[in-house]
Amino acid sequence: MLLCVAAIATRAAFAVLPVADVGRVAGRVLADEANASVALAVALYLILRREARAAAAAGRGSVLSGNLLLVFGALFCTVAGYFALQPMMEAARAGQGGVAFGTLHGMSLAFFGLKTLLVLALAWRLGPR
């Protein structure tokens, strides 16, 4: 999902829409992605927590597994990169706030990129063994 948002959806908007409309379309796509990311992170947390507890009870690991840390990291990137920065970006776009829109946009992009890497690492760890 993350790679589709980054590689297809936002690029397609830039290709076919006027610049004034691209921000609205990309914002909507990213809002949906952020909400889906939170829901998926909660679901993965519940599944992986059960697995980590079973492994810890069998003496094969910790209750706080590396997979759980990757989920927490991706969730943090979603909360910080979208839910915290988005209101600040709106204020900056309106000429309010102390941080420039471009700086906030760059920070948001960095969180999205880091989240993508964390999710790819989790997929690799959970893949066929």
Name the predicted role of every residue range.
Residues A9, L85, V119-L122:
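Hydrophobic/aromatic residues in alpha-helical transmembrane segments
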Residues F72-P87, F112-T116:
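Mid-bilayer segments of alpha-helical transmembrane spans in multi-pass integral membrane proteins
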Residues M1-V42, L46-A55, R93-G98, G102:
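Interfacial loop at the N-terminal end of multi-pass membrane proteins
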